[in-house]
Amino acid sequence: MLLSLAPRKSIQVTKAKPTIIVGDNSYLSVRGDGTNPKVILTKGRENGHLLLIESALGLPFTMVDNVATHRTELSGNITMKGASTLLLIWSGLRWVQISHSKNF
């Protein structure tokens, strides 16, 4: 059996538009705009939805450990830059961190 993520989708986040519409995506390449925006994720499709976020080489952005506002339960706030990655799973209520690689 092969586990495969959907084709990568490139997204830019800004301080004015920090929300990422996850939809049925499972692999996002995200880049900031120089303001280090704090990302907000929309809900997952169903329980168990996996989401891999890869930091595009370029300007950083922050994943915030805040279930109420950002729908993310992380080990702490994570600055994504370089080629960092973050793997999340949708619990039905929030995105929960599985792993994080700081690749810079």
Regions found by a protein language model. Name each.
Residues 68-74:
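Short beta-strand and strand-turn-strand segments in soluble, beta-rich domains
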